[in-house]
Amino acid sequence: MIRIGTRGSLLATTQAGTVRDALIAAGHDAELVIVSTEGDQRADAPIAEIGVGVFTAALREAIADGLVDAAVHSYKDLPTAPDPRFMIAATPVREDARDALVARDGLVLGELPAGSVIGTSSPRRAAQLRALGLGLEIRPLRGNLDTRLNRVSSGELDAIVVARAGLARIGRLDAVTEALEPVQMLPAPAQGALAVECRAGDTALAQVLSQLDDADTRAAITAERTLLAELEAGCSAPVGAIAEVVESIDEDGRVFEELSLRGCVATLDGSDVIRATGIGTPDRARELGLSVAEELFELGARDLLDEGGRDR
């Protein structure tokens, strides 16, 4: 029996459930084990205040202590600094990485009047919303997805911005009034992706879990998180990134794969946003992340991050 550790929220158990079901379909016995994390216990505190790894540390300790065999994380919650005790055995196919607007009266972002109150506790989302210059008021937002959605339906907020992937996984895409394109708002690095982690030395389990791995997703996540790590920015920093594997055709008509990466760094107040893009190949995803990070540095990203503080 493969014991899979997960947080207890509906979203977390649904995500982990997809991994459990895939393992069962492949002929392996698997079950979910609920693990309480500090992020769940301190649901009202801003994530940036609690610290890096707030949703993942307890799951990792459960693996280390032998309480579970593996854990399923929202990949974007994992600290960028590697922990030698563990390995990412699988990165399953990624959900749509875009952010989603859930607004009153079916409104899209451009239709919200100046002064509208939008909920988000993500510095990245808040900074990019402010940078659009729409005169929106940003309010802190924590709690599970149902709680967040209710703050719009109750009239407390005019809109919220959340990850589209989360709403898709719990079957609430009906609430989305607009999927925000990356040109409007770059997602968090690794948004919409899952990380299936196990003990570094558990090669037999890692081999089983690797059946769930998607090479294109792994390449994209590697590029995005390399950029994030190189910027020395934590998962709460105002940094956005999205990488995609795309097919191109060379001059001889042959199809080949490229990896594109877009990244941005913003000031917390949205007064300045620096953007950079790059093209590479999936097998050199890390190098692409490094090169786009270097371009961001050349454009002044270091000063912007120093202004907002860094946290690995």
Curated annotation (Swiss-Prot):
Modified residues (S-(dipyrrolylmethanemethyl)cysteine): C235
SUPFAM superfamilies tied to this protein: Periplasmic binding protein-like II, Porphobilinogen deaminase (hydroxymethylbilane synthase), C-terminal domain
Keywords for this protein: Porphyrin biosynthesis, Transferase
Xref: Gene3D superfamilies: Periplasmic binding protein-like II (3.40.190.10), Porphobilinogen deaminase, C-terminal domain (3.30.160.40)
Family as reported in the entry's similarity comment: Belongs to the HMBS family.
Other information: The porphobilinogen subunits are added to the dipyrromethane group.
Protein name per the record: Porphobilinogen deaminase
Organism: Mycolicibacterium vanbaalenii (strain DSM 7251 / JCM 13017 / BCRC 16820 / KCTC 9966 / NRRL B-24157 / PYR-1) (Mycobacterium vanbaalenii)
